[in-house]
Regions:
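Chromatin reader modules
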Residues: 1-117
């Protein structure tokens, strides 16, 4: 499905944001779906009802599966919020997700201002 009118440029910029996140060494925990079976995190699907990761988001962007940049941003925010919901407040994973959440919010706010949506 093609993006809605006026969303082509914002979605192109979202691809750049996602690629820049994926390139970061410390972003490894967010690149692929959580292997909850392999990690024996059997409660994960009960706690996290909408699993999301940056690799999946990138594939959805490449396949034009987002109508708007806002829908893509929601999925990116799920990556961070899922991590913070599942992991203990103040843990290494929680702190990493919190840091990425803040950075992403800043970049997305800037994108919205520049693209005027």
């Amino acid at each position: 499905m093609p993006p809605l009118p006026g969303q082509e440029e914002p979605l192109k910029r979202m691809i750049k944001i996602v690629n820049s996140l994926l390139a970061r060494q410390d972003c490894a925990p967010f690149r692929e779906p959580v292997d909850w079976r392999g990690l024996e995190l059997y409660d994960y699907p009960q706690i996290i009802t909408k699993m999301m990761d940056l690799g999946t988001i990138k594939r959805k962007l490449e396949r034009n599966q987002y109508l708007t940049a806002h829908l893509c941003a929601q999925d990116i925010k799920f990556v961070w919020s899922n991590c913070m919901k599942y992991n203990a407040d103040g843990s290494d994973f929680w702190l990493l997700a919190k840091s990425y959440s803040r950075r992403f919010d800043d970049r997305y706010r800037k994108l919205r201002q520049e693209c005027k949506f």
